[in-house]
């Protein structure tokens, strides 16, 4: 990772510690005044206004993302949109300004008040870098984001021949989560085409259930059991491959030199994979996680260090259905632990993941991660120590943003009028195969990938656009080598191919969900 992410990023070393006069601080007398709000102590979406003229402390999740960054691990995720057609610089720059006005946190820096990090009043617009991929060094493109000096959002626009473009959005995870970044992208394209972005909506958040429909024990008892299991389970890292394995795939090196590898499946294969998942009564996400788990085990076996225990960190959105608002983090984490014996049968592995995923969603169990984080954040030094422990907390991160097309296309239209740039819908589907940002500019694909941290050496993200499955892979090149992402991507593709060819799950799911 050092090849892309260089520079010192200590806990506070790169953040300018500013005097009290250099930022606004909300006082009790101001708390009830117009323009001020009280922040949720955990992670909820609290900004209701377009502009925030006040400062609030970072939520525990935002603080964790800030604290966990270090040299080579900047805690940034990436979203990439590929376009065909002319992209006008001034029009794009104006769209960035307009879209950012709806998302104040994209304009904020981080300072410190009484020893704790706070968001400063919006004063930094996201930067846009127009580059020629042939001549620009990757260390210039993908440098870390210093939240003490600049916005946590950066655009890198890479020009390719024949009016092709790669627009990469690099976001510090303290700013927002992946779904919020997709909506920010959607607002940008709405502004680019002189349309009105979709209105913000804040439906009521569903409450947790006391008992999961599929769980035979009370939720609290199961949580205690899973917490103890988490503490006793020590996942193994991905092992560095030998020189022979590395040389075998040297030709797969990323020619555009992004930190991550991207690939997409054909519409026919994507449909076959979804159909196989449907026949097995599981979701596409369950199949993808199972395929990644088998690929992780195959990786270590090929490296000569067979793993017995793996853990996948699964980001879980806590949004209410239909919610849309200013960019922020509204998510938690769930952890899926499996042994190598659990992964022998792909079908049984997929069913066990499906059972656990349903329990997690039904109980909103990912919120318990935030509850724990809120307690730890009262002692920042303890949180810092935990993030610096020389142990592997997760083998890999696997995220799924789902069908991104509706979020990208979200814009307001006059009653009775359709999107003038949307192509005709074929076969009765609600989402066209391609979508035009403007009359002459078309989105051809979209990828995303979450950040990694020391010990968690791989990150995988799945998106669906135009009926096709898109996947991006990010690996720790310091530990695994320069072509690690390309090699792991091949293994995941092979596992998904086997799933599409013969996923027939007749075995009953596990009685107790294993998260």
Regions picked out by a protein language model, each given a short descriptive name:
Residues 45-113, 135-153, 298-515:
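Acyl-thioester-dependent acyl-group transfer interface
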Residues 6-12, 20, 29, 47:
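N-terminal amphipathic/hydrophobic targeting modules at extreme N-termini
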Residues 85-103, 169-186, 262-302, 471, ...:
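Acyl activation and transfer enzymes in specialized metabolism, enriched
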Residues 93-196, 261:
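Acyl-thioester-dependent condensation/acyltransferase catalytic cores
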């Amino acid at each position: 990772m050092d090849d892309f992410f260089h520079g010192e990023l200590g806990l506070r070393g790169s953040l300018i510690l500013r005097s009290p006069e250099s930022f606004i601080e909300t006082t009790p007398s101001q708390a009830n005044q117009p323009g001020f709000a009280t922040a949720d102590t955990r992670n909820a979406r609290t900004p209701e206004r377009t502009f925030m003229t006040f400062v609030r402390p970072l939520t525990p999740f935002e603080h964790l993302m800030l604290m966990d960054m270090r040299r080579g691990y900047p805690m940034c995720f990436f979203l990439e949109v590929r376009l065909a057609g002319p992209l006008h610089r001034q029009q794009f720059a104006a769209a960035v300004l307009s879209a950012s006005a709806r998302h104040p946190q994209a304009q904020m820096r981080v300072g410190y008040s009484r020893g704790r990090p706070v968001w400063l009043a919006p004063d930094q617009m996201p930067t846009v870098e127009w580059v020629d991929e042939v001549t620009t060094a990757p260390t210039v493109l993908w440098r870390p984001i210093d939240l003490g000096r600049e916005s946590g959002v950066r655009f890198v626009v890479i020009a390719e021949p024949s009016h092709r473009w790669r627009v990469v959005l690099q976001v510090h995870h303290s700013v927002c989560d992946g779904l919020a970044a997709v909506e920010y992208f959607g607002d940008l394209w709405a502004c680019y085409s002189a349309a009105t972005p979709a209105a913000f909506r804040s439906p009521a958040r569903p409450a947790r259930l006391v008992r999961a429909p599929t769980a035979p024990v009370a939720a609290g008892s199961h949580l205690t059991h899973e917490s103890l299991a988490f503490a006793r389970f020590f996942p193994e890292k991905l092992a560095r491959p030998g020189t022979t394995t590395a040389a075998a795939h040297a030709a797969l090196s990323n020619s555009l030199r992004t930190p991550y590898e991207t690939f997409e499946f054909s519409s026919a294969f994507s449909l076959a994979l979804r159909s196989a998942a449907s026949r097995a009564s599981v979701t596409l996400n369950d199949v993808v996680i199972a395929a990644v788990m088998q690929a992780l085990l195959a990786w270590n076996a090929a490296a000569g260090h067979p793993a017995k225990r793996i853990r996948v960190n699964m980001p879980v959105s806590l949004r209410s259905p239909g919610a849309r608002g200013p960019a922020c983090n509204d998510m938690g984490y769930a952890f899926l632990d499996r042994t190598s014996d659990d992964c022998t049968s792909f079908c049984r592995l997929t069913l066990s993941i499906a059972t656990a995923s349903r329990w997690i969603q039904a109980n909103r169990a990912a919120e318990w991660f935030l509850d724990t984080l809120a307690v730890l954040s009262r002692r920042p030094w303890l949180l810092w120590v935990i993030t610096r422990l020389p142990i592997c907390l997760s083998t890999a991160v696997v995220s799924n943003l789902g069908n991104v097309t509706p979020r990208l296309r979200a814009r307001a239209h006059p009653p009775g009028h359709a999107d003038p740039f949307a192509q005709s819908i074929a076969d009765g589907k609600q989402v066209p195969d391609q979508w035009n940002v403007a009359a002459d500019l078309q989105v051809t694909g979209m990828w995303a990938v979450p950040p990694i941290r020391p010990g968690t050496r791989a990150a995988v993200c799945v998106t669906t656009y135009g009926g096709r499955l898109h996947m991006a892979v990010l690996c720790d090149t310091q530990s695994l080598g320069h072509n690690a992402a390309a090699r792991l991507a091949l293994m995941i593709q092979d596992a998904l191919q086997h799933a599409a060819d013969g996923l027939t799950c007749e075995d009953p799911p596990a009685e107790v969900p294993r998260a």
